Curated annotation (Swiss-Prot):
Belongs to the IPP isomerase type 1 family. GO terms for cellular component: cytoplasm. This is Isopentenyl-diphosphate Delta-isomerase II. One of its GO terms (biological process) is chlorophyll biosynthetic process. Mg(2+) binds at residues 116, 128, 223, 225. Its cofactor is Mg(2+). Disulfide bonds: none annotated. Substrate binds at residues 112, 147, 151, 164. Catalyzes the 1,3-allylic rearrangement of the homoallylic substrate isopentenyl (IPP) to its highly electrophilic allylic isomer, dimethylallyl diphosphate (DMAPP). It comes from the Eukaryota.
């Protein structure tokens, strides 16, 4: 048997013995990685001594660096994420975002954590599908929310009614008539604002358009989204979830313009989310006029993806 064959054989036995240890408990993502052929094929030997009765293989420290990278990807950076709110951290790893290309074709999925890491966004060009809900009452006032202080990206900024992403699951992957995104919007309005599903029927959401943008939040986190812009006109009772929302308020067009003035002047520490700012600057007020005239369907353009990065 050649030295290379000996190395491969011993490497396989080493990894199998390692994984069979009853004391070893691995996160599912790590278990998949360590069982994979890529793990075994990346083993590098420092020295090989072959004889008829003896083979000694010393495995390089490459193992630990590969394992460390896998651990960070699967579980996050323990040191820098220590201050993350427990609820937000759980959602970061439980939620699987829908990865798309710039034409909004589904290409895969990944954790909310990875999809919001600027390092991954830049190195892997991760782009995920998202939605922004604009809910108006019968007086044509827009419901705004202030994101909670514990949000990982853009805490305490003012934004539109609800902003999130559809999950990688059957009911939220339906492309026809943006049904998957509308299902996700209904789910998140309950989760963030306590609005029951029956108060915001899926067929009442009007998809007006799509935009693609990228926005860093701080040195570590950010957004890179293909965002569906959904309007709905309903009178609802709001019961904000404090894990998601710090405050809410309804505004008319003049009140929103006054808020924008204060933000631009740096008054009261007010800030807007970057996606809300893009919608305000490019679409909102002309669409709002359609809301008041009852001609919202005339403003719909779901064929164009507005690239605003």
């Amino acid at each position: 048997m050649s030295a290379a064959s000996h190395i491969h054989s011993v490497a396989c036995r080493l990894s199998s013995s390692f994984l069979a240890s009853p004391k070893l408990k691995l996160h599912p993502r790590l278990s998949f990685f360590f069982h994979s052929s890529s793990f075994r094929n990346h083993i590098i030997t420092r020295s090989v001594f072959c004889s008829s009765s003896h083979l000694s293989v010393r495995v390089s420290s490459y193992h630990s660096s590969v394992a460390a990278k896998a651990t960070t990807s699967a579980m996050g950076d323990t040191a820098t994420d220590a201050g993350m709110d427990a609820v937000q951290r759980r959602l970061m790893f439980e939620d699987e975002c829908i990865l798309v290309d710039e034409n909004d074709h589904v290409v895969g999925h990944d954790t909310k954590y990875n999809c919001h890491l600027m390092e991954k966004i830049e190195s892997d060009n991760l782009l995920h599908r998202a939605f922004s809900v604009f809910l108006f009452n019968s007086k044509y006032e827009l419901l705004l929310q202030q994101r909670s202080a514990t949000k990982v990206t853009f805490p305490l900024v003012w934004t539109n009614t609800c902003c999130s992403h559809p999950r990688y699951r059957e009911s939220e992957l339906v492309d026809e008539n943006a049904l998957g995104v509308r299902n996700a919007a209904q789910r998140k309005l309950l989760d963030e604002l306590g609005i029951p599903a029956e108060d915001v029927p899926v067929d009442q959401f009007i998809p007006l358009g799509r935009m693609l943008y990228k926005a860093p939040s701080d040195g570590k986190w950010g957004e890179h989204e293909l965002d569906y812009l959904l309007f709905i006109i309903r009178d609802v009772n709001v019961h904000p979830n404090p894990d998601e929302v710090a405050d809410v308020k309804y505004v008319n067009q003049d009140q929103l313009k006054d808020l924008l003035r204060k933000v631009d002047a740096g008054e009261e520490g007010l800030k807007l989310s970057p996606w809300f700012r893009l919608v305000v600057e490019n679409f909102l007020f002309k669409w709002w006029d359609h809301v008041e005239k009852g001609t919202l369907q005339d403003a719909t353009d779901m064929k164009t993806i507005h690239k605003l990065t």
